[in-house]
Amino acid sequence: MKAGIHPDYHMIKVVMTDGTEYETRSTWGSEGAVMNLEIDSKSHPAWTGGNQQLMDRGGRVSKFNKRFGGLGL
């Protein structure tokens, strides 16, 4: 492998939506950085069977429903 072309690979802490934490190696951030997840396997409809609502960040879902809700597909 060529020297100096690969990103730094270090330990970070990942915080899940329910507050559980684990450490893993990543190229994201810097050594000791904390990654707070907004959606993970415990809150994403693909893994929960669609029983939970997605968060409406910035009103995007509301805006979409207001604009296209009356189509009645």
Swiss-Prot record:
GO terms for cellular component: ribonucleoprotein complex; ribosome. GO terms for biological process: translation. Keywords: Ribonucleoprotein, Ribosomal protein, RNA-binding, rRNA-binding. GO terms for molecular function: rRNA binding; structural constituent of ribosome. It comes from the Bacteria. The keyword Iron does not apply. InterPro entries: Ribosomal_bL28/bL31-like_sf, Ribosomal_bL31, Ribosomal_bL31_A, Ribosomal_bL31_sf. Transmembrane segments: none annotated. Pfam families: Ribosomal_L31. Belongs to the bacterial ribosomal protein bL31 family. Type A subfamily. Part of the 50S ribosomal subunit. PANTHER family: 50S RIBOSOMAL PROTEIN L31, CHLOROPLASTIC (PTHR33280), LARGE RIBOSOMAL SUBUNIT PROTEIN BL31A (PTHR33280:SF6). HAMAP family: Ribosomal_bL31_1. Binds the 23S rRNA. This is Large ribosomal subunit protein bL31. The gene is rpmE.
